[in-house]
């Protein structure tokens, strides 16, 4: 008999050989199935946050390499850019961009807190209380906000899942940006980088980059995939999905702020227009690809944190938010005993075991 591989077409009536096993069945109960088993959400929160810190240091080193490799501004002029030609240069708008990013960051943390309150409300924990009751403050910060028109997602653990989605998307984008800015060095259009300062202490500069998110360190030439645009678009996507569940106004407010911030980035000559456009596209695509899942991050991303020997367990146990469930099994033997007792006129009761 001629044997055919399981992926080929065999003649009618030909019995497939023993090796013709679908891939899913072939790996049933194997190592890969164990790897697909989701980690506890709390473990993912801690470990992905640790991964984000590690990626931040990788980006800080990449920024330093890019600074040293940047073309000499006195020799190489900035590239032609249509956005620069259409928009008048306003240098101080770079500060406005930083202020708007800080505003969106605070709004995102506020939204995350409100999502946590929605989770507590879903599991029946109620609203937290302050030691001293301040009517206006307590109602604003501790009350549950829910926009029913935009609430199509399960509320249990929604704050945890939203944070995992945000931090994993951000880590992936920063890691990709670290690679891109090192690969190709472009002439900078930024005013402060036309006479770039010398980095005297590289280690100190790396630490300052991580601690201040780049605001207190020296770095020039990191152009492709704008970091400002990445975080702005992440806030936009976060509020487009989760902010709308808290209050209807979050979507339009954040959208207007993000669009104006994009304008500020190009008008202040902080980045080329392509840097902004590519960052917008990549951030939206990454946030959608990571997705919202009750198991947290996609299992492929969880593979990168399973090997960590600390920061949470690898197996799921009974969570603090789980509700106890009692299951009663009806025994035929007990029913027979009850029938005998009834027929004999006995009034005793037969106790059953609860499982």
Curated annotation (Swiss-Prot):
Catalysed reactions, as listed in the record: an N-acylsphinganine + a 1,2-diacyl-sn-glycero-3-phospho-(1D-myo-inositol) = an N-acylsphinganine-(1D-myo-inositol) + a 1,2-diacyl-sn-glycerol; a 1,2-diacyl-sn-glycero-3-phospho-(1D-myo-inositol) + an N-acylsphing-4-enine = an N-acylsphing-4-enine-(1D-myo-inositol) + a 1,2-diacyl-sn-glycerol; an N-acylsphing-4-enine + a 1,2-diacyl-sn-glycero-3-phosphocholine = a sphingomyelin + a 1,2-diacyl-sn-glycerol; an N-acylsphinganine + a 1,2-diacyl-sn-glycero-3-phosphocholine = an N-acylsphinganine-1-phosphocholine + a 1,2-diacyl-sn-glycerol
Single GO molecular function: sphingomyelin synthase activity
Biological processes annotated in GO: ceramide biosynthetic process
GO cellular component labels: endoplasmic reticulum membrane; Golgi membrane; plasma membrane
Residue intervals annotated with topology Extracellular: 66-89, 187-205, 251-275
UniProt main location, coarse: membrane
Catalytic residues as annotated in Swiss-Prot or TrEMBL: 228, 271, 275
Keywords: Kinase, Lipid metabolism, Membrane, Sphingolipid metabolism, Transferase, Transmembrane, Transmembrane helix
Matching Pfam families: PAP2_C
EC number(s) given by UniProt: 2.7.8.-, 2.7.8.27
Subcellular location(s) of the protein: Membrane
Highest taxon, organism lineage: Eukaryota
Cytoplasmic side of membrane: 1-44, 111-165, 227-229, 297-355
InterPro entries: Sphingomyelin_synth-like, Sphingomyelin_synth-like_dom
Enzyme class: transferase
Transmembrane is among the record's keywords: yes
Transmembrane segments: 45-65, 90-110, 166-186, 206-226, 230-250, 276-296
Recorded phenotype for the gene knockout or disruption: Elevated ceramide levels and growth arrest; cells were arrested in division but replication of DNA and organelles continued giving rise to cells containing multiple nuclei, kinetoplasts and flagella.
Outcome following mutation: residue 270 to F: Dramatically reduced IPC synthesis
Membrane topology: Multi-pass membrane protein
Family: Belongs to the sphingomyelin synthase family.
Record-linked PANTHER family: SPHINGOMYELIN SYNTHASE-RELATED PROTEIN 1, SPHINGOMYELIN SYNTHETASE
General function of this protein: Predominantly synthesizes inositol phosphorylceramide (IPC), with minimal sphingomyelin (SM)/ethanolamine phosphorylceramide (EPC) synthase activity. Specificity is likely to be defined by residues in the lumenal catalytic domain that interact with the polar head groups of the phospholipid donors. IPC is synthesized by transferring the phosphoinositol from a 1,2-diacyl-sn-glycero-3-phospho-(1D-myo-inositol) to an N-acylsphing-4-enine (ceramide) or an N-acylsphinganine (dihydroceramide).
Name of the molecule in the record: Phosphatidylinositol:ceramide inositolphosphotransferase
Gene: SLS1
């Amino acid at each position: 008999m001629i044997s055919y591989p399981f992926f080929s077409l065999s003649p009618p009536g030909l019995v497939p050989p023993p090796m013709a096993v679908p891939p899913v069945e072939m790996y049933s109960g194997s190592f890969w199935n164990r790897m697909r088993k989701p980690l506890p959400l709390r473990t993912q929160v801690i470990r992905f946050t640790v991964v984000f810190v590690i990626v931040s240091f990788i980006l800080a080193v990449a920024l330093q390499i890019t600074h040293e490799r940047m073309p000499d501004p006195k020799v190489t002029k900035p590239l032609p850019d249509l956005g620069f030609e259409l928009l008048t240069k306003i240098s101080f708008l770079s500060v406005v961009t930083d202020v708007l990013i800080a505003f969106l960051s605070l709004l995102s943390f506020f939204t995350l807190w409100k999502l946590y309150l929605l989770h507590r409300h879903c599991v029946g924990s109620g609203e937290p209380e302050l030691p001293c009751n301040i009517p206006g403050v307590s109602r604003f910060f501790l009350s549950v906000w829910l926009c029913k028109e935009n609430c199509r997602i399960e509320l249990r653990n929604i704050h945890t899942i939203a944070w995992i989605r945000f931090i994993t998307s951000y880590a992936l984008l920063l890691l990709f940006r670290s690679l891109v800015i090192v690969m190709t060095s472009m002439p900078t259009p930024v005013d402060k980088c036309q006479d770039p300062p010398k980095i005297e202490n590289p280690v100190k500069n790396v630490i300052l980059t991580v601690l201040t998110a780049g605001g207190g360190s020296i770095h020039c030439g990191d152009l492709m995939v704008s970091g400002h645009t990445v975080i702005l678009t992440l806030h936009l996507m976060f509020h487009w999905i989760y902010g709308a569940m808290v209050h209807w106004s979050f979507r339009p407010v954040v959208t207007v702020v993000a669009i104006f911030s994009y304008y500020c980035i190009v008008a202040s000559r902080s980045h080329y227009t392509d840097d902004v456009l590519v960052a917008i596209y990549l951030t939206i695509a990454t946030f959608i690809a990571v997705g919202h899942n009750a198991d947290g991050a996609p299992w492929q991303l969880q593979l990168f944190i399973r090997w960590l020997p600390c920061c949470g367990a690898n197996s799921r146990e009974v969570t603090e938010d789980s509700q106890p469930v009692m299951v009663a099994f009806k025994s035929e033997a007990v029913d027979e005993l009850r029938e005998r007792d009834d027929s004999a006129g006995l009034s005793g009761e037969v106790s059953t075991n609860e499982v």
